Amino acid sequence: MIKTFAQAWLEDFWHTGKHKRVPSELEARLVRKMDMLNRASAYKDLQAPLSNRLHALHGGRQGQWAISVSGSWRLCFRFADGNVFDLELVQYH
């Protein structure tokens, strides 16, 4: 279950399905990925589908995980006690 968001606007998107910071072509896919995160009880629940490209992050993001949304867009988060914390949407360049 998603417990906390690192970005207040992403939490607004979670509740409304719209936000000016989310490109319209990304909205439906982002909702599906966030639903998947909300249902997950362990990071292993996110290994399928393979398009998630679940991976542990390193360096300054040590302890975080990421899944692919589309193109260079990723959802980054911490997973603890079966819950998602500090969820954020980032675009890698």
What are these regions (language model features)?
Residues 58, 65-93:
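Enriched for short, Lys/Arg-rich terminal
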Residues 34-37, 41-42:
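Basic, amphipathic alpha-helical segments enriched in Lys/Arg and hydrophobic/aromatic residues
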